[in-house]
Amino acid sequence: YCNEIRRLDYYVGEVVRELESQNALSNTVIIFLADNGRPFPRAKTRLIDDGMKTPLLMCGPGIEPKTSTKSLVSSIDIAPTILELAGLDKPKSFQGKSFAPILSNPNAKIRECAFSEHNWHDYQAYGRSVRKGEYLYIINKFPDKAWIGPEDSVSSPSHQQLRKAMLSGKELTPVQSDIFLCPRPGEELYDTSKADKLQIKNLANDPHYADVLNEMRKILKDWIDSTLDSVPENPTKDSFDHETGKRILEKNQFSDDYAGKKRRAEYLICPQ
């Protein structure tokens, strides 16, 4: 990862120098973003911050250098932002919101909530989440399975060493043991502030957070309904072993059922 950062810095510098040579730098917005694909335990495919919170760096005209923001944005907001910066209107079919106001005012807010989802990725899965302020709410429709991550995480030395330690009776930290938790809760609620930055303390059953839980439930349900989402009734089976990460080969392993198929979500042009 350190080498990737060094390479990024070098090649972005090359692009900047080329833009300068063409006298185009002052009229160019540079955007760097990354996916959530690091294959580490409790990262890739997880709907907590370590799985969903990704880098987003921008520079260009109207963007104050060396500033940062805590405002909530989603990846679907990038396209509307580019269009606004280019002076173009956003098509009605776009779900995202332009975060151009944040570029000139880091304290500006463009959205109250951001949503995430996890579907089949080497293993059966259906997870949905909503982030509002400091609260994160997650539902899991396959709680009988450990949320271990994809095959490249399960087969990694870090995951296998943790499994070896667990099986030998060594005490793991709550963060380490979480990847082996089975069954898992069907609902999770976290306060992502300094009190629980790693999302370890599930507040879903805490009566003090009942109002927050009900609010987050409704927000997520409304989003699921608006996007015509649904849980697959005949999901594709696991393609890899949960413990070893080795390939499983079976007949009729893959299903044509998927999230949203029951409600024909693929025909939805613009969620309301």
Q: For each of these PLM feature ranges, what is it?
A:
Residues K53, K170-E187, K194-Q272:
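Long, internal low-complexity/basic segments
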Residues A86-E188, D211, R263:
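C-terminal cap/loop subdomain of S1 sulfatases and analogous C-terminal strand-loop tails that border
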Residues R6-G13, V73-P80, F94-S98, R184-E187, ...:
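A structural signal for well-ordered alpha-helical segments within the folded catalytic domains
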Residues N36-I48, C59, A195-L198, D206-P207:
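Active-site His/acidic residue clusters
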Residues G13-S21, A43-S93, K97-E112, K201:
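Substrate-binding rim/cap in mid-to-C-terminal beta-strand-loop elements of soluble/periplasmic
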Residues R7-R42, A86:
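Metal-dependent active-site segment of extracytoplasmic phospho-/sulfohydrolases and closely related
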Residues Y1-C2:
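Short glycine/proline- and acidic residue-enriched helix-loop micro-motifs
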Residues G37-P39, I63, F99, W120-D122, ...:
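Short, solvent-exposed loop/turn segments at secondary-structure junctions
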